[in-house]
């Protein structure tokens, strides 16, 4: 943003540094997402660029950590086109392991049994967050169903929160992904609509503080 414009409106920080503007619809959706996480399964949060997906993801993670009733795990791999189910298993092992030498087995059968053992040891529901999930390969999306079931077989609960562009929701509606898409809970961050004037006023005031 131009320095001259900021000075004209009396702002001391850019729009990107402002807090998140919460509408009533957003607050309801945020609450519903948290309820869905407690129940487990695949949860998709989608929206266009700049709508607030990453901010919402961070808020969810922060709330869950503060409440300390659900364990938070997240995939940090940046190139989601190359993320596969092994990458997500690694993320879970890194975040859930209680011992430094608790390494993930490379053989699939042993890996899943070890994960089940960790689930029983931690004895809490788990939330696995994946940002930029619209770049995930369809095979990886399908594998998420098996990952959730592996945790359920150990009497655990796993929620996979996939965050991405509207393409993610379209992919999950594809008949080829019906196996996972039919079970997914979809949430969409929408436009402000009638709240736009309030948002502009709030944004300028927020950047003055």
Predicted features by range, described:
Residues 1-40:
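A short, basic N-terminal segment
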Residues 185-197:
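Conserved AAA+ ATPase "SRH/arginine-finger" region at the nucleotide-binding site
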Residues 66-91:
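AAA+/P-loop NTPase substrate/partner-engagement loops
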Residues 6-13, 83-102, 206:
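Conserved NTP-binding/hydrolysis module of P-loop NTPases
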Residues 42, 116, 120-162, 167-170, ...:
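Conserved Walker B catalytic segment
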Residues 39-59:
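Walker A/P-loop nucleotide-binding motif
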């Amino acid at each position: 943003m131009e320095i001259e414009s900021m000075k004209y409106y009396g702002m001391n920080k850019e729009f990107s540094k402002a807090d998140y503007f919460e509408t009533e619809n957003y607050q309801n959706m945020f609450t519903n997402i948290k309820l869905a996480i407690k129940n487990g399964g695949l949860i998709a949060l989608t929206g266009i660029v700049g709508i607030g997906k990453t901010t919402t993801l961070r808020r969810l993670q922060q709330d869950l950590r503060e409440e300390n009733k659900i364990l938070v795990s997240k995939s940090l791999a940046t190139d989601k086109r190359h993320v596969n189910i092994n990458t997500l298993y690694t993320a879970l092992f890194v975040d859930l392991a209680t011992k430094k030498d608790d390494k993930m087995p490379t053989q699939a059968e042993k890996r899943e049994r070890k994960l089940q053992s960790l689930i029983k040891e931690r004895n809490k529901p788990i939330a696995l967050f994946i940002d930029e999930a619209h770049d995930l390969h369809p095979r990886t999306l399908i594998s998420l169903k098996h990952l959730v079931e592996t945790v359920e077989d150990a009497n655990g609960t796993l929620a996979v929160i996939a965050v991405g562009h509207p393409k993610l929701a379209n992919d999950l509606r594809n008949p080829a992904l019906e196996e996972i898409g039919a079970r997914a809970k979809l949430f969409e961050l929408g436009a402000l609509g009638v709240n736009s004037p309030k948002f502009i006023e709030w944004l300028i005031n927020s950047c003055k503080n």
